[in-house]
């Protein structure tokens, strides 16, 4: 289950594989089976602690313009034209059919499709 979690103001993490302490602290606050979907302070969607996200919408497969880290599967899908970037916000979640979690080990074809998260945005 995805849980909305706000990133700190100015948070930049181009190398989320190098120092995972922030992500570990967030995960420690969640229940078993919950995964944080990070939201920037302006309400724009980012990604999770270990995947990029793709929203399944009526307009096709959309991914946030500014992920924390662009993964190889994310780049491959963009270059192939299978997904497109959009200025996605929390409000867009209510209109999507689901959220795919993708990374190098989970290509879109076999990626889990989760229901959009509901509820308030949590903060550290």
Question: Residue locations for each model-derived region?
Answer:
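Helix-start/capping segments and mature chain N-termini
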Residues: 1-124
């Amino acid at each position: 289950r995805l849980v909305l979690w706000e990133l700190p103001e100015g948070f930049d993490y181009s190398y989320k594989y190098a120092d995972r302490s922030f992500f570990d602290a967030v995960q420690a606050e969640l229940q078993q089976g919950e995964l944080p979907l990070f939201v920037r302070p302006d309400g724009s969607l980012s990604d999770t602690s270990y995947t990029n996200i793709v929203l399944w919408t009526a307009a096709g497969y959309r991914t946030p313009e500014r992920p924390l880290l662009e993964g190889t599967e994310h780049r491959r899908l963009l270059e192939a034209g299978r997904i497109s970037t959009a200025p996605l916000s929390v409000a867009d979640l209510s209109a999507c059919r689901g959220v795919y979690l993708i990374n190098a080990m989970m290509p879109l074809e076999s990626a889990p499709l989760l229901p959009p998260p509901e509820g308030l945005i949590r903060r550290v």
